[in-house]
Amino acid sequence: MAETEKNLQSLDHIPIDVLFEILVKLPAKSVARFLCVSKVWATMIRGEVFIRSFTSYSSPQKQPRLLFALVDCLRLYNKMLYFFSKSTLVSTPLLPWDPAPGPPVKPHRFGLFWRARCLRYLPKHYKSLMEELKPKPLVVEEQPDFLSRKELRHENSSYVHGLMSFLCSGEQVIFNPSIGKSITLPTIKTSGIISQSFLGYDPINAQYKVLCLTNVTRFCEHQVLTLGAQNSSWRMIQCSTPHYCGEKSLCIDGILYYSAFTSFTTVLVRFDVRAESLEVASKFPEGLKSSNGITLINYHGKVAVVSKNYHNDHHDFNLWVLEDTKKQQWSNVLVSFHTGVTGQFHGGLEVLGTSDMGEIVFAPNHFEEFVVYFLDQKSNRIRSVLL
C-alpha cells in the first residue's frame, strides 16, 4: 500500500505540460483509465483545452464508423435496445427489461425493426474520444442504473456529436453508445408531462444542452439544461410563437431544428443552442402534403425535410431544403431509384441522413441482413455496405 502511494506521488511530480503532451497522444481507452490516477490528472483530462487538443490530434488517424441501433419489438414492452458498429461481431444489449442472460440476437425480417432515428455517424472531430466498439458478451458486467428499472420504455431519441438523449421510464437519459455509460438528468419542475426532449451542441463553447418541452396546456413550455455545468439547473425560455412539438429534430452547427405545430400550420422551429433563443424558422413547404413520416437531415450544411412516396417498382424521396430562412424559401430535390437496386429489401427504405462525403444514406425497415445504402448524387451511383 505504501509503495503504491509512493508511485502515485511520483506521478504528480511530472510537469503538467509534459504530462499533457504524453496523454494527448495516447488512445482514448488509455486516457479514460488515467482519470482514476489523481484529481490533478482527472481535472486536466476533463478540461476543454485537453479535449480539443485530443480530438484535433487523433481525428486524422480515425476513419468514420457506422453506429446503429436495433429494437427487439417481438418483446413488445419487454424491449431490448442493441447497438452495433461496423467492427462489432456480437451484439450488446443496452436496454433490457430483464437483465438475465438471453440468447444472441438473430436478425429476422419481422422480428427486428430498424430504428432509423438512432442511426447516425460518429463525427470526425469527436469520435476519437469515444472508446472503440469491440465484440462484447451479451451480459454487461456493470450495467447502468436504468437497466434494472421496470416498465422500461425507449422513447424518441436524438443523437448529437457522439451522445444520445432519450426518455426512459419518464426520466431523461444522456447516453454514450461507444462506452456504454449514461447519466440521468435532474428532474424537471413542471405541472405537465414531458412531450419531447432534444439534445443540442454548441461547437463554439463545446457545450451540450438539452431542450425539454413539456405539455402543460395546449402548447408546450420550454426548459434548457447545460450538461457538465456547475450547479446546472433547468431554465425556462420563451418562444414568440406558441406551438406543440413534433418528433423529429436535427442539430447543425449549433442550431437545433425540430418540427412543430401551431394553431394553423406545421412549422420548423429553430433553437440557437449558444444564445438559448427560440423562433420559428419557417413554415413547412406548400408542396409537402403531410408531415407524417418525415425525416430531418443535414443536406450539405442545410436542414432538409424528407418525405417518401410508396411505389411498387421504385423508391421516391422528396428532399425539401431550406435555402433562405428570412424569405422562407425552399428548394425541392427528387431522389428516385428502382427497387431492383435493393433486391429483397424493397419492402421499405428510410433516409437516415448524409455521410461525411455528402452521400445520402438509406436503410430498410425490414431485413434479413444488416445492410446500408449510400447514394452519390454527383455520380448517380449507389453502393451498399453489408455489416
UniProtKB/Swiss-Prot annotation:
It comes from Arabidopsis thaliana (Mouse-ear cress). Disulfide bonds: none annotated. Pfam families: F-box, FBA_3. It comes from the Eukaryota. Residues 8-54 form the F-box domain. This is Putative F-box protein At1g47800.
